[in-house]
């Protein structure tokens, strides 16, 4: 009998998306094929401690509006051996400090936001010589930072929306830029996700408060012109032989749903109040769907991505415009990425297996 592949599912983390990472991990733990994979669940506390947990999916769900999390009491504290000669070893930091608690073949970093999705854990895993699911250091960092995502997409000749970046030394948007952007605008942490810290601004006198909110999560802020149009999404998946495929296109509809006339897909709408309708496949012409799929793969290549990504679009009268790239999209039960692949004929367990197998085939180092 072939030995099962040992997969460390790493979740939680130090970012404001800690809870959503836990929910994604719970869904993944339910769907990894136990006949093929031996799961080693590793939680990261909001303070940054790594712990070996029991990995029970039911503890990683949103229950009656309460968000899950990882604490120091969730399990045994551990560290990843950074020496490639001890590749994949998880070492105890408890009473038996230095003992090997587990050794893994591959890491699935189900981490959203800074200190996980931004190239940091990817760099650690490269140093340790441990294969991992998803994008490498460069693509993870570029995909996390909306400023550099847009720069790379623009350099590749891909359509992006108008925007202004506010660095920590810059207090507000200039009058010239305000005139160009118009209203409304969306004010966001440049390196964040799950709509945390995001505001829709319809009057310029509300801009300072929106910038202050965004800067609670990131000192660098991006202010984006609103783009009228439908919200479409498309998944990209790399296979073990290196070829790429784009998924069925999906659509998120918020305006008019549960009173959300502003059409703002915020954190509560995404995760807590069922305030959006998800159409998979999207009700668009075949030509539009094919254009979106093609742009998704071009965007994936533009940031030198690997493994997987979800590319978000606005469908305007002039055609699709790329909003963001998510190099570790959500894997919750309502997340679009697995739903779009299911509609494309790849069920959840097969999708996860493909990602793990691709990570192992790719390995680490320059490639």
From Swiss-Prot:
Residues bound to Mg(2+) 2: 324, 326
Keyword ATP-binding: yes
Residues the entry annotates as binding ATP: 178-233
EC nos: 6.3.2.4
Cofactor binding description: Binds 2 magnesium or manganese ions per subunit.
Pfam families found in the cross-reference section: Dala_Dala_lig_C, Dala_Dala_lig_N
Gene Ontology BP annotations: cell wall organization; peptidoglycan biosynthetic process; regulation of cell shape
UniProt keyword Cell wall biogenesis/degradation present: yes
ATP-grasp domain mapped to chain residues: 150-357
GO cellular component: cytosol
Superkingdom assignment: Bacteria
Pathway annotation from the record: Cell wall biogenesis; peptidoglycan biosynthesis
Names of the cofactor(s): Mg(2+); Mn(2+)
Signal peptide extent: none
Residues bound to Mg(2+) 1: 312, 324
Protein function: Cell wall formation.
Similarity comment text for this entry: Belongs to the D-alanine--D-alanine ligase family.
Protein name per the record: D-alanine--D-alanine ligase
Source organism phylogeny: Bacteria, Bacillati, Actinomycetota, Actinomycetes, Mycobacteriales
Name of the gene this protein is made from: ddl
């Amino acid at each position: 009998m072939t030995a099962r592949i040992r997969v460390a599912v790493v979740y939680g983390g130090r970012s404001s998306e800690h809870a959503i990472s836990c929910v994604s991990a719970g869904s993944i733990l339910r769907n990894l094929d136990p006949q093929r994979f031996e799961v080693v669940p590793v939680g990261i506390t909001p303070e940054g401690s790594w712990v070996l947990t029991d990995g029970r999916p039911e503890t990683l769900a949103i229950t009656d509006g309460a968000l899950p999390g990882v604490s120091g009491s969730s399990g045994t504290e551990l560290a990843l051996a950074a020496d490639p000669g001890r590749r994949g070893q998880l070492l105890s930091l408890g009473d038996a400090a230095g003992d090997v608690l587990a050794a893994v073949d591959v890491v699935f970093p189900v981490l959203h936001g800074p200190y996980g999705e931004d190239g940091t854990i990817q760099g650690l895993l490269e140093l340790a010589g441990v294969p991992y699911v998803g994008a490498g250091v460069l693509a993870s960092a570029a995909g996390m930072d909306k400023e550099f995502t847009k720069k790379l997409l623009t350099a590749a000749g891909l359509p992006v929306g108008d925007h202004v970046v506010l660095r920590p030394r810059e207090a507000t948007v200039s009058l010239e830029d305000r005139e160009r952007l118009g209203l409304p605008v969306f004010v966001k942490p440049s390196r964040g996700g799950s709509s945390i810290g995001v505001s829709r601004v319809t009057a310029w006198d509300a801009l300072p408060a929106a910038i202050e909110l965004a800067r609670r999560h990131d000192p660098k802020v991006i202010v984006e012109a609103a783009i009228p149009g439908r919200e479409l999404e498309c998944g990209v998946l790399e296979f073990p032989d290196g070829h790429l495929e784009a998924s069925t296109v999906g659509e998120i509809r918020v305006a008019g749903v549960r009173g959300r006339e502003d059409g703002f897909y915020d954190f509560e709408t995404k995760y807590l109040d069922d305030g959006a309708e998800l159409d998979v496949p999207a009700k668009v012409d075949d030509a539009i769907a094919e254009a979106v799929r093609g742009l998704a793969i071009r965007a994936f290549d533009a940031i030198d991505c690997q493994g997987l990504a979800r590319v978000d679009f606005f469908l305007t009268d002039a055609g699709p415009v790329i909003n963001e790239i998510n190099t570790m999209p959500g894997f919750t039960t309502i997340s679009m990425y697995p739903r779009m692949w299911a509609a494309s004929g790849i069920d959840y367990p097969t999708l996860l297996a493909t990602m793990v197998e691709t990570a192992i085939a790719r390995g680490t180092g320059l490639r």
